[in-house]
Amino acid sequence: QYIINIAEHFKSHNINDDSYWHEREFSNIYDELITIKGIGPWTAEMFGMFYLLERDIFPLQDLGILKAINQLYCVDGVPLHIDQVIAISDRWKPYRTVASWYLWRSIDNEAILY
């Protein structure tokens, strides 16, 4: 059903090429995507990061990101509060997508082969 919802959205908005996405601000794209049943914040953020190549996205709901940032910044075993995670990620603006990639890599022991 979610695939059908996405297809219907594309059809009703006459989305048939990349210019629909690449000529708009990501905040507007994000707001539009999360209105489609089956697409939530995480999916919209991944779309922005990996398809649109947005450089300043920090997926706060990503479990890998939260695990990595807690491994690096957690004190005395107490998980960071979301406000602390936001404050840390704010230091990485406007390149939080790159920071996200490094955080993911920090918890993944497998080499990436290009």
Regions found by a protein language model. Give the residues of each.
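Short amphipathic alpha-helical interaction segments
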Residues: 21, 25, 35, 39, ...
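Catalytic DNA-binding helix-loop module of base-excision-repair DNA glycosylases/AP lyases
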Residues: 25-71
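Alpha-helical ds-nucleic-acid-binding substructure associated with the helix-hairpin-helix region
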Residues: 1-35
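A basic, often C-terminal nucleic-acid-binding module that engages the phosphate backbone, implemented
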Residues: 28, 74-114
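Alpha-helix boundary/capping residues
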Residues: 6-10, 36, 72, 92, ...
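Substrate-binding clefts and substrate-entry loops adjacent to catalytic sites
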Residues: 16-17, 71-76
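Short, well-structured alpha-helical segments
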Residues: 1-8, 41-48, 82-86, 100-103
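Short helix-capping/linker segments at secondary-structure and domain boundaries
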Residues: 11-15, 52-57, 106-114
